[in-house]
Amino acid sequence: QAEMMMQFMQGGLDMATFWPLFWDSEFGFRSFFDKKTGKLQPTSEIMKIFGTFQGNELIEYTASPAPEKIPSLAVRDAATGKMALCLLNKNDFTVEAAVGGRLAARKKRVEVEQFRMSADRMSLEHAPVCKAKAGSVSLAPFSLTFIYL
């Protein structure tokens, strides 16, 4: 869902419809929440996360590895000037990502926030925002990482 939301935003679509992907049985109802824990399903979490970025200005940047290997998106909030880079690691191994262009030139230190898929693939684990050196960041396996400038 994260990659699809990024593609929607890159294409200029500022709103998307939600459909849950997980259900409790073959003929069960797909829910927005896990009935046992009351937590949002991963798909619901992704929609909630990206909802804060929809409608923002897309900005140009360079990133390594290439977007085909690590889908990414950079946005700027016109009201606050705050920029965010989103990187999606769909691999089962850690990836070192380098950021360049307007994003890298802006600050020496950045804030990094990461959401990691749990081992059972049923929930997103949130790593709190932390400070990091600008230019490079480690992307955990199966994670969605935001770099804020």
Set out the residue ranges of the language-model regions.
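Short linear proline/tyrosine/threonine-rich motifs used for host-factor recruitment
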Residues: 124-126
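Solvent-exposed beta-hairpin/edge-strand motifs
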Residues: 102-122
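A general structural signal for short secondary-structure junctions and capping/turn motifs
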Residues: 6-10, 75-77, 102-104, 136-139
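C-terminal beta-strand-rich structural cap/linker in extracellular carbohydrate-active enzymes
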Residues: 128-149
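Active-site proximal loops enriched in glycine and acidic residues that flank catalytic Cys/His/Asp
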Residues: 17-21, 62-63, 87-89, 99-101, ...
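Aromatic/acidic polysaccharide-binding cleft in carbohydrate-active enzymes
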Residues: 1-73
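Surface-exposed, flexible loop/turn segments at secondary-structure boundaries
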Residues: 24, 93, 120
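Carbohydrate-binding surface patches
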Residues: 67-106
